[in-house]
Amino acid sequence: MYPVDLHMHTVASTHAYSTLHDYIVEAQQKNIRLFAITDHGPDMADAPHYWHFMNMRVWPRLVDGVGILRGIEANIKNIEGDIDCTGPMLDQVDVIIAGFHEPVFPPQDKDTHTAAMIATMARGDAHIISHPGNPKFPVDIRAIAEAAAKYNVALELNNSSFIHSRQGSEPNCRAIAEAVRDAGGLLSLGSDSHIAFSLGDFTHCERILQEVNFPQDRILNVSPRRVLDFLEQRGMPAIAELADL
């Protein structure tokens, strides 16, 4: 099991069912040392209000040995790569995941999806691209992997894509893992948990990683320190409270 989960949702996204406290308890039981709460960006219909993200500064950084990252799953809005995490919000989050969601960016064609995803990476705010294997948003996988390596953005293997949502993702996810491996890029693992019991469940992601012989040192989730070093390399300030995780 990997000790870090970088994608999950709380009741602040109203189609999810657990609180921050629920996740802390589950993390302690599963020996998860660091997780990121990444509720949906405000352009989604049931997303938290802008104030939710602006007030995340009240969250503790460390609770009973479990580190907490303040995150967002932002929406890619257009072919120019705009996302719905801008201005003062950028100063309140530690980790920015960005991805396509149908209510914000209706599926179009492969070239448009590829251009929008690469533009998002090039803009420099997103650290991770969420569920890039979604078959409703086909992309040029090789081009995406090469751009991610160029811009130091991690592509996500999303465990939920194999079991609950985005059915038909598995062939794309395998191809993405292979392409990222060959491009020298990074992968991020996300449970995409919408209820605390799913925290840290990477069962299907781990199977893909083994099948393609993906290098462990290029998976962010191998340790809290690996994640924190990556975020600092990307220009985020060091988080003193998490230094000893």
Swiss-Prot record:
> What keywords were assigned to this record?
Hydrolase, Metal-binding, Zinc
What are the GO MF terms of this UniProt record?
A: phosphatase activity; zinc ion binding
> What positions does the entry give for Zn(2+) 3 binding?
73, 101, 131
Q: Coiled-coil region(s) at which residues?
A: none
EC number annotated for this UniProt entry: 3.1.3.-
Give the top-level enzyme category.
Answer: hydrolase
Looking up SMART domains in the UniProt record yields: POLIIIAc
Name the NCBIfam families for this protein.
PRK09248.1
Q: Under which name does UniProt file this protein?
A: Probable phosphatase ECA2529
